């Protein structure tokens, strides 16, 4: 190995332990990551404790000697690397992208003249993505004029230049060039896809200028373009196309789901809305466009009783429920409405006026109280109560997980759940705590309904651990609960003491309550990674090899900094190898490399029965994700 040439790929710190990934020169281009400088190194074989191991064409080692830093802008360096590369297929993509990105077209020329081929079908990066803003037009022209070498699809170049640049001279040149070589490009589709990528519905001055260039060059279908511009409400292009005399069928335009603003452009140019065209507008529009257009048609009295049929009413109910109120106010819909459907929609949308309308037309509010509770909204439910509704517990649908959402966390809903014995206080609190923003007032309200000093929350420990694991801190709501609101168990008190740095109290609680071998406390201590606290636990459990094996497994998930401490300072060696390898797969890459460098087999065994592993069962109980394994409480 000593006679080989190596380059440094990456340095990783593992606490106070450094690991280096180095690569032999012949595999350099297989692993380089968008760098313009590289460091030649050699393993420091003479250092005490030196280790090295192979890792998929690269090597892991703990000691290196840096020899020199080289630049990939230096031709001699590049030639030497290329000459030593074993597999030259597709290796030049990085270099071309690097030189394009840095405006080094002279170096691209050198690669081309040296016949170092760019292969767009290889795994190298897309060279167009690296075109810099500075000198963008010149770089694009370079790619276009050398595309017989780059072999990028002309459609991809056209899409990039037209959709993502403001280089109008380049656009003009490219379109004319493609005409000369008889290359057919679907510019209409490019334009449409560009609008979709911009989420549409907004005028883009620069892109509009591009479209005008394409119109001038006569490479787009004006009728198709008008349709696209109408759909995406591109006012400037619609106006421009009409100004240059583009022919169109007004009713066809109306079928394009146009906005009110676009509609007015056509009306201001002499187009007339008759009953047929109004029907088209009413039957094809949905969403916010329909709401605006509908209000305009109502205000201008285009909509008459004759046009209001069941089909229109159904469209409004299904897709634009908020505008139903205006129809109700002006027209007789008594024979056109399914009041059951409308009442449920009104409850879902909290449309109090529509609810009142249904009630005034004979709807029995009591038939919908259960439905309103299932789709609870406080203002809507209160309104139904004020209208004489009473809630029956028969067939009442209650979902405990609803309490994890803000709209259910109010006194009215909580009282209904408690007064009707739909759930226990413990479960109510458990679910209230699951809400991300946490409603302190509601939690206090629930606690004040009972003697909270006697309440036991069996899932609280797991919630605290899961919260700390995912956030690397503890939410104040758990600290408040443990300290003042309830009578927590000693495990909860110990865990809160550890995560709040009150280690003396934690040690006292552990000793007084014989919790020295509790795995949940151990896992939190591993995550906290306080050396003194860990030594305290290890000294008590020094004779329990099983406990020490748990510490190593937890360190792979909880805090990788602790791995080196547990392995080298405490002297724990992995023995539960199936669990060890399984957790290793879910652990951080740095952790895996540490074990590999220290001579351990980290290959994955068959995982068919992994659910039976004790460590998997532990995390399943906590509700902690392990890679592809998803656990919920």
UniProtKB/Swiss-Prot annotation:
Protein name: Putative ankyrin repeat protein L774
Keyword Hydrolase: no
ANK repeats: 91-120, 123-152, 221-250, 252-275, 338-367, 369-393, 517-546
Keyword Amino-acid biosynthesis set for record: no
Organism of origin: Acanthamoeba polyphaga mimivirus
Keyword terms: ANK repeat, Repeat
